[in-house]
């Protein structure tokens, strides 16, 4: 990254309308409480439509029936998505039983959706059930605060089931960072939990009155697993251990995957190394990164507002020096670390504490009772007897964690009886999609509903070329916002229009390289034809242990993205 021509620390100009909305919202209250009582519409009006995002919700509608309802002169079938705050993806079995019941009784779709940010979402919550869902979460010690919009989102933590002590320490830091960076406004408690209004002035010492310029994502990662995809995130703490004990973190800043089709001022970017810090400085450094982005991030153009753009504009050394100044530290040199993979190890793994951990593959993270595979019922039955916890992974899977030897057989029987341990090939285990249609308002093409059958066809290509047990990290995202993390895949499909995608190639298995667009706006037959040819070449020409993405770069099929701000669109 060039340091020769750093830009201004603050972007001058007319602020975006989102900044007006936040300023006028009275610390995120708006008129949400009044809007809740408006029975004339199933949605939220005006600024409240956006303000509810700070409370963990998005207003959506069923796009499959949107045109039909419009023809009948009806408003869209409004319903909310709610995303829980769940640092590190850890959820107790008591909490699981509560969310299972709510999904069954109070949502249109009856499902629980595990996300690749280690939490769960409810889709299809009608307006009348919005307040009850927040109260249900509160009753079991959960909330949805700051899981959307311009705040520090759900903090991820490697779902490492092997080194229990290290995971426990890293998870505690993920929780501490999450709590430290939460908004201080009482709006959430007043609106959803009926807590009394206190006659004090709200203050936001870290986030400020207008919060952050854009969404902000944080991870705690334990090498050698990069399961949380650190390069998709603004701020990353890479755990450094000595003798199995956590001693500090390497800090990487400025990753992010969202782009806009055709807008060359937007690009996906991997995170940059800042340095090493001892544990005692973790919260001060986290706060310093967030407040620097708060003050320097672009508030005039939301498409250019994320930390990755701030870092490129002001220069890495300038941003790093400001973080050091605010935190009162000097970063030490980066300590050695290495990533070897991103996938979850499906099946049983024994931890060093002699407890067992069962990782269940959940295709696309969608937990529902399917014909012949009652996944939702199976997990409920396991939750009723399991003494440990569940962990949601960043690959949208679920770990039944800390199972004693005496419970192992019983839990396995329940899992098998409910279709939770059906064997799948490595390719399916390493494929992922965002939700997209029918609920996401931004979706341009199918993703979750498209991926299973598309994976069948890719598996057939692998079989045809004699490598049925190989895998390629493959991801589909329904729009360029990139929730499916296709911009860190070996094969990335980015929705362009119904049935059409941009095909990106050249990422790698460990998730440290951005893939480049190979073909634009193509349909499934063209995608499969390209993959058939390239996978055939990979099978014949690859070097020992060479992944598909690395092969496409070495063979000159695609040029690697080396400096995204300058060469992503070339």
UniProtKB/Swiss-Prot annotation:
Pathway: Sulfur metabolism; hydrogen sulfide biosynthesis; hydrogen sulfide from sulfite (NADPH route): step 1/1. It comes from the Bacteria. [4Fe-4S] cluster binds at residues 434, 440, 479, 483. One of its GO terms (molecular function) is heme binding. One of its GO terms (biological process) is cysteine biosynthetic process. Keywords: 4Fe-4S, Amino-acid biosynthesis, Cysteine biosynthesis, Heme, Iron, Iron-sulfur, Metal-binding, NADP, Oxidoreductase. The keyword Nucleotidyltransferase does not apply. InterPro entries: CysI, NiRdtase/SiRdtase_haem-b_fer, Nit/Sulf_reduc_fer-like_dom_sf, NO2/SO3_Rdtase_4Fe4S_dom, NO2/SO3_Rdtase_4Fe4S_prot, NO2/SO3_Rdtase_4Fe4S_sf, NO2/SO3_Rdtase_FeS/sirohaem_BS. Its EC number is 1.8.1.2. The keyword NADP applies. It catalyses: hydrogen sulfide + 3 NADP(+) + 3 H2O = sulfite + 3 NADPH + 4 H(+). One of its GO terms (cellular component) is sulfite reductase complex (NADPH). SUPFAM superfamilies: Nitrite and sulphite reductase 4Fe-4S domain-like, Nitrite/Sulfite reductase N-terminal domain-like. Its cofactor is siroheme; [4Fe-4S] cluster. Binds 1 siroheme per subunit. Siroheme binds at residue 483. Component of the sulfite reductase complex that catalyzes the 6-electron reduction of sulfite to sulfide. This is one of several activities required for the biosynthesis of L-cysteine from sulfate. Alpha(8)-beta(8). The alpha component is a flavoprotein, the beta component is a hemoprotein. Belongs to the nitrite and sulfite reductase 4Fe-4S domain family. PANTHER family: SULFITE REDUCTASE [NADPH] SUBUNIT BETA, SULFITE REDUCTASE [NADPH] SUBUNIT BETA-RELATED. This is Sulfite reductase [NADPH] hemoprotein beta-component. It comes from Salmonella typhimurium (strain LT2 / SGSC1412 / ATCC 700720). The lineage of its organism: Bacteria, Pseudomonadati, Pseudomonadota, Gammaproteobacteria, Enterobacterales.
């Amino acid at each position: 990254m060039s340091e020769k021509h750093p830009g201004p620390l603050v972007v001058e100009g007319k602020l975006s309308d989102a900044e007006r909305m936040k300023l006028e919202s009275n610390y995120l209250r708006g008129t949400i409480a009044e809007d809740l009582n408006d029975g004339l519409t199933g949605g939220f009006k005006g600024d409240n439509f956006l303000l509810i995002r700070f409370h963990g919700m998005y207003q959506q509608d069923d796009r499959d029936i949107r045109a039909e309802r419009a023809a009948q002169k009806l408003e869209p079938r409004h319903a909310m998505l709610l995303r829980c705050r769940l640092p590190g993806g850890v959820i107790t079995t008591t909490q699981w039983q509560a969310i299972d019941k709510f999904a069954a009784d109070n949502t249109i779709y009856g499902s629980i959706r595990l996300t690749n940010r280690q939490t769960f979402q409810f889709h299809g919550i009608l307006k009348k059930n919005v307040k009850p869902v927040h109260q249900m979460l509160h009753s079991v010690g959960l909330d949805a605060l700051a899981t959307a919009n311009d705040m520090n989102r759900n903090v991820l933590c490697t779902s490492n089931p092997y080194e229990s002590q290290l995971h426990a320490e890293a998870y505690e830091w993920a929780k501490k960072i999450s709590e430290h960076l939460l908004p201080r406004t009482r709006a959430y408690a007043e609106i959803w939990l009926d807590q009394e209004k206190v006659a004090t002035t709200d203050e936001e010492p870290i986030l400020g009155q207008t919060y952050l310029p854009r969404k902000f994502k944080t991870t705690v990662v334990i090498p050698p697993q990069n399961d949380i995809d650190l390069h998709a995130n603004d701020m990353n703490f890479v755990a450094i251990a000595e003798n199995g004990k956590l001693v500090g973190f390497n800090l990487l800043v400025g990753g992010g995957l969202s782009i806009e089709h055709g807008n060359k001022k937007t690009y996906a970017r991997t995170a940059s190394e800042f340095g090493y810090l001892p544990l005692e400085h973790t919260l001060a450094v986290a706060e310093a990164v967030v407040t620097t982005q708060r003050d320097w991030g672009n508030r005039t153009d939301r498409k250019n507002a994320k930390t990755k753009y701030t870092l490129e504009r002001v220069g890495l050394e300038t941003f790093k020096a400001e973080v050091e100044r605010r935190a009162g530290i000097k970063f030490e040199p980066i300590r050695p670390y290495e990533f070897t993979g991103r996938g979850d190890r499906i099946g049983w793994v024994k931890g060093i504490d002699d407890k067992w951990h069962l990782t269940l593959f959940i295709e696309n993270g969608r937990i529902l009772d399917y014909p012949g595979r009652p996944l939702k019922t199976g997990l409920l039955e396991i939750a009723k007897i399991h003494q440990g916890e569940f962990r949601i992974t960043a690959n949208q899977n679920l770990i039944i964690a800390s199972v004693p030897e005496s419970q192992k057989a019983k839990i396995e029987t329940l899992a098998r009886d409910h279709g939770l341990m059906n064997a799948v090939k490595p390719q399916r285990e390493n494929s992922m999609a965002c939700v997209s249609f029918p609920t996401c308002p931004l979706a341009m093409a199918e993703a979750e509903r498209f991926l299973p059958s598309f994976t069948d066809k890719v598996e057939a290509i692998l079989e045809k070329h004699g490598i049925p047990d190989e895998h390629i990290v493959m991801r589909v995202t329904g729009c360029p916002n990139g929730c499916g993390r296709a911009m860190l895949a070996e094969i990335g499909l980015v929705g362009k229009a119904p049935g059409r995608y941009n095909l990106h190639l050249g990422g790698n298995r460990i998730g440290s390289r951005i893939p480049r667009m190979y073909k634009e706006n193509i349909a499934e037959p063209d995608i499969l034809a390209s993959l058939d040819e390239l996978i055939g070449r990979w099978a014949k020409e690859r070097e020992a242990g060479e992944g598909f993405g690395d092969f496409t770069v070495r063979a000159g099929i695609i040029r690697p993205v080396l400096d995204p701000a300058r060469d992503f669109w070339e």
